[in-house]
């Protein structure tokens, strides 16, 4: 039996200080986990997906071959529970989020002239799971979180957080 688990994100992070952008970055990352089960024995592997299909396929096949060999050399897994159904699910949460290109322009005009400090995390996260019994599960969501502080002239702070899936500019 083979179980595949996928996790990934495509997200943006922007750090603000004194109502100016101090740091920004994009994350485009995905990982694949493999679990090989044979004769009550369990082996696991995982790697970061490169996006190059041929390279990623070769790495996956190499790991499966390694786990096949390793599974004959390890003791049985006393906690092994095998899936018994082939149920599948798919949930994709669409959002009217903040595009990466528009994020800074959406925030800076509203905080101009204010001592605004914070971080924006914005983007999509993915999770998937499949096995050779036919189970397939996929979850995808888009969200944002703007965690910020407003600093007064006397150095007092008001903390706030604006988070969700649909950005409301008003």
Identify the meaning behind each predicted range.
Residues 6, 36, 120, 150-152:
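Hydrophobic side chains in beta-strands
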Residues 12-69:
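N-terminal alpha-helical targeting/anchoring segments
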Residues 19, 31, 118, 123, ...:
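Glycine-centered flexibility motif
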Residues 43-45, 51-83, 114, 141-170:
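Internal alpha/beta scaffold segment
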Residues 13, 29-33, 42, 132-136, ...:
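Broad gene-expression machinery/nucleic-acid interaction feature
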Residues 2-13, 55-139:
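Acidic low-complexity segments
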């Amino acid at each position: 039996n083979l179980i595949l688990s996928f996790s990934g994100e495509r997200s943006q992070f922007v750090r603000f200080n004194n109502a100016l952008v101090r740091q920004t970055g994009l994350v485009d990352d995905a990982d694949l986990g493999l679990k090989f089960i044979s004769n009550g024995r369990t082996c696991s592997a995982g790697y970061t997906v490169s996006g190059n299909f041929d390279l990623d396929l070769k790495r996956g096949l190499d790991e499966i071959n390694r786990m096949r060999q390793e599974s004959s050399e390890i003791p049985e897994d006393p906690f092994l529970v095998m899936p018994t159904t082939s149920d599948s699910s798919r949930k994709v949460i669409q959002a009217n989020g903040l595009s990466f290109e528009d994020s800074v322009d959406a925030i800076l005009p509203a905080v101009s002239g204010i001592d605004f400090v914070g971080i924006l995390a914005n983007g999509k996260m993915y999770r998937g799971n499949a096995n050779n019994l036919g189970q397939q599960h996929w979850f995808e969501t888009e969200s944002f979180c703007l965690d910020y502080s407003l600093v007064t002239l006397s150095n007092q702070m008001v903390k706030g957080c604006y988070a969700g899936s649909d950005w409301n500019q008003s």
